[in-house]
Amino acid sequence: MAGSRLETVGSIFSRTRDLVRAGVLKEKPLWFDVYDAFPPLREPVFQRPRVRYGKAKAPIQDIWYHEDRIRAKFYSVYGSGQRAFDLFNPNFKSTCQRFVEKYTELQKLGETDEEKLFVETGKALLAEGVILRRVGEARTQHGGSHVSRKSEHLSVRPQTALEENETQKEVPQDQHLEAPADQSKGLLPP
């Protein structure tokens, strides 16, 4: 059972030598006599790597490009956006990539202030039709105001809240009665 032995036990030379002696290998490999005549100074035996505790310090420093700072600021201000990356299209450019290209283009024109350049880049992309939404804007537009719903309920008196709920209940009931008639008309074949 020569194949049942682990490769980590002994060197390739000692394993091959034992297989030749046992008669499993009929012919010696070409390298066997050369290895036997000129053995290496240190026999190549597998040794398990030592287990290291703790975090090893990486000797390689991180590589940061000028664009990376622009991208980091873009994602912190505007987020990742709603549009997914189209990986099937080789000519696809993400909103962030367009922003970085426009930023560097405006920077080459002579603008040096980073904050002003960042704002001008956003305006330039808006002029091209790219809509950028800040991270906090989507939440405030959804609610209709800058006040959160929890603080809204705390400032409203209970009686006015009940009156609003009653008016909201009345309106949907009237709309609900009209909706089935419209739907039934649309479902019937002409």
Swiss-Prot record:
The keyword Ion transport does not apply. GO terms for biological process: mitochondrial translation. Residues 139-190 are annotated as: Disordered. Keywords: Acetylation, Disease variant, Mitochondrion, Primary mitochondrial disease, Ribonucleoprotein, Ribosomal protein. It is found in: Mitochondrion. Disulfide bonds: none annotated. GO terms for molecular function: RNA binding; structural constituent of ribosome. The modification N-acetylalanine is found at residue 2. The modification N6-acetyllysine is found at residue 102. Residues 166-179 have a biased composition (Basic and acidic residues). InterPro entries: Ribosomal_mS23_dom, Ribosomal_mS23_met. The keyword Membrane does not apply. One of its GO terms (cellular component) is mitochondrial small ribosomal subunit. It comes from the Eukaryota. Component of the mitochondrial small ribosomal subunit (mt-SSU). Mature mammalian 55S mitochondrial ribosomes consist of a small (28S) and a large (39S) subunit. The 28S small subunit contains a 12S ribosomal RNA (12S mt-rRNA) and 30 different proteins. The 39S large subunit contains a 16S rRNA (16S mt-rRNA), a copy of mitochondrial valine transfer RNA (mt-tRNA(Val)), which plays an integral structural role, and 52 different proteins. Belongs to the mitochondrion-specific ribosomal protein mS23 family. It is linked to Combined oxidative phosphorylation deficiency 46: An autosomal recessive disorder characterized by childhood-onset mitochondrial respiratory chain complex deficiencies, particularly complexes I and IV, and hepatic disease. This is Small ribosomal subunit protein mS23. It comes from Homo sapiens.
